[in-house]
Design a protein with these regions (language model features):
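Active-site substrate-recognition segment that forms the wall
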Residues: 2-10, 32-34, 38, 69-74, ...
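Short loop/edge segments at beta-strand edges and connector loops
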Residues: 18, 97, 144-146, 269-271
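Glycine-rich FAD pyrophosphate-binding loop
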Residues: 8-29
Length: 335
């Protein structure tokens, strides 16, 4: 939706063809960590991640201004606990206060070494709802309830897309189908679903947690309304979005191990989403094999984070400009 918004602002007529209800797949399921400094971020992705994080305050401001809706963007930062699989990185600041990590978050049971990252977090559901309002304000059309199944091509040039309900004609098509991008006929991209189960707890008190807390096996993302989002699994389960009660219980217990007061916290909701993975865990951003066809998919864990910069560089590419960030590592032809 960020790309649709950007293209419309640059004068294009935009139609979003959505397989289901807009914004109800990976974006709806995401935790909303804007983890540009995560030590697990591939180095090839770092320039995009850092650039997108810098764009976020203005991006959210524009969406709020266009929609009249509030988006919960928090800048309290992330407490990163040590992870044996990844060094903290140059952007991490060791927490050296005499009281350690509990100086920042007294509710944490953890007392060892930790690092503070200057990251933000956003409520993805509030963001998507506001973007849909902004899209309506910008007169972006949305055709929902029927997936694009085929790229229509004539003489090596895009003519539009076909769904079970209708054909939509357009000189430019962008495959933004996430985990379903590979199902887009001959114009598919090698994405696959990576299942993640999560839950939301009601904090026993509003000030229980201010920072995002990221540990090797669990993360906690506080919302301004008192919810705490707990995640997440990473499962190769195809397109299965069923929630397993035992898995949710394990996540809840891991959260309580970090913040004991969460042990008795009420569960508001549990859900599963499908991250759009790729073979090298990097997004696919670039031109397709025929004129007028582009791909912006496979953002894996970073779809919410990368929304602003994806809109910028793909708009530049579609308009025939040189993208401000080199996209060679993300091309469709690398597979």
């Amino acid at each position: 939706m960020s790309l649709a918004f950007s293209l419309r602002r640059n004068g294009a007529q935009v139609l979003v063809v959505e397989r289901g209800e807009p914004g109800r797949e990976a974006s709806h399921a995401a935790a909303g960590m804007l983890a540009d400094l995560d030590p697990h971020t591939p180095e090839a992705l770092r320039p995009l991640a850092l650039a997108s994080a810098r764009l976020y305050p203005e991006f959210v401001h524009d969406v709020q201004d266009e929609s009249g809706s509030h988006v919960d963007l928090r800048d309290d930062g992330t407490i990163q606990l040590p992870d044996p699989t990844a060094a903290p990185g140059a952007f991490a600041t060791p927490i050296t206060d005499e009281g350690g990590v509990q100086t920042l978050e007294p509710s944490l049971s953890y007392t060892g070494v930790a690092f503070l990252l200057k990251e933000r977090a956003v409520d993805p559901r509030a963001l998507i709802a506001a973007m849909l309002k902004a899209a309506k304000h910008r007169e972006i059309e949305v055709a929902s309830g029927s997936a694009a199944t085929e790229l229509m091509v004539s003489k090596d040039r895009v003519q539009g897309v076909r769904t079970a309900k209708s054909d939509y004609h357009a000189p430019v098509v962008v495959n933004c189908a996430g985990a379903w991008a590979g199902k887009f006929g001959a114009g598919g991209a090698p994405t696959k679903p990576v299942k993640g189960q999560m839950l939301a707890l009601i904090a026993p008190r509003r000030d229980l947690l201010r920072h995002v807390v990221r540990a090797p096996e669990v993360y906690l993302v506080p919302r301004s309304d008192g919810r705490i989002v707990v995640g997440s699994t990473s499962e190769d389960a195809g397109f299965d979005k069923r929630v397993d009660p035992d898995t949710i219980q394990r996540l809840h217990q891991k959260a309580a191990d970090l913040v004991p007061e969460l042990g008795q916290a009420r569960r508001l909701e549990a859900w599963a989403g499908l991250r759009p993975g790729t073979p090298d865990e990097l997004p696919i951003l670039g031109r397709g094999e025929v004129d007028g066809y582009f791909v912006a998919a496979g953002h894996y864990r970073n779809g919410i984070l990368l929304a602003p910069i994806t809109a910028v560089v793909m708009t530049q590419l579609i308009r025939g400009m040189q993208p401000e960030i080199e996209l060679g590592a993300f091309g469709v032809d690398r597979f």
